[in-house]
Amino acid sequence: MLTVPRLLRFRPRPSILAVAVACLLQPQASAQFNNAAGVAIDPEGVLRTRIVTDAGLSAEQRRAAVEALPGDLRKAAPLRKVALSRLEAAISARGDRGVPDDVAKLAGLTRIQYVFIYPAEGDRPGEIVIAGPAEPWVTDAAGRVVGAETGSPTLLLEDVATALRSFAPGQPQDRLVGCSIDPTKEGLAKMQDYLRTVGKVNPKGGADQIVAGMREALGPQTVTVQGVPAGSHFAQVLVEADYRMKLIGIGLERPPVKMPVWVDLAAAGAVAANALQRWYFVPDYECVRVSEDDLAIELVGRGVKLCGADEVVKPDGTRLSASRADQASRTFTEAFTAKYAEIAARSPVYGQ
């Protein structure tokens, strides 16, 4: 979760807030429609957005990618099943030759909708099968694997393996999987000192000077990953979705669908100078259906919910819960949640 300082106290117009908060995130460019976006980590370990301006694949490129797939995988299927034991056997049979592409892409599954359990009978071992919609896949210009027909992200074996290992038998089942992007306590204290020096209503210096001072005072923020290896693709997806959602909220990345964003909703002078806003995702499935014999499970809905929390910062950089909720933040989080399916359809990282 990225804490976004709210700097409206000395904002003469809405655009100044976006410029001021930009110093905290350091994106390389605003993502626009028809562009592919991702994240990259530079040699100093700083997370930045990565924009590919001409991300579209030509019809010929898509056709060639699909024709290179095994016959049965060239067509979309409303329900495709993948047996985990056969998956494991296919991987073992390859030895050190690497995982076949159709195995690495889980036969083109775009989501897991069902889990079927087949108990052992006689000499036949038991089996666990995952199932869901599937389609042929291509790799877009940003390096993301997506369905050739819908653009939905393709499930990856490495992500499923990471998830299974995180909740392996014998491990605590209540462990948290997530990420957090936070300023340091020292950085917050230094920024509070800096804001007091520039004034509240009539700041000393122009916007560029204030932004530079804030950037230097706050310093780098820290990315923390919980529950999964920090170097995994699973972790990268968590961090990218979290990071880019905040860029949308503060106006540094254009939302892929029409929706209100926090930077346009927040009113000058309506918040305290030491206020902080936190936004974070949580699962929000409608329900999990289980058959009467407990051998079949269906995940109903494709829910992700965006939540918000209001905080204030003490002079020493300590963060405390705020006593008053921010209506602009609530409107933004509710809109993001309501339009999540549309957003994910246009920006694959949210589908992942």
Where are these regions (language model features)?
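N-terminal secretory signal peptides that target proteins for export/translocation
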Residues: 1-12
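Outer membrane pore-forming secretion/assembly proteins and partners of Gram-negative envelopes
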Residues: 30-352
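Bacterial N-terminal signal peptides
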Residues: 11-26
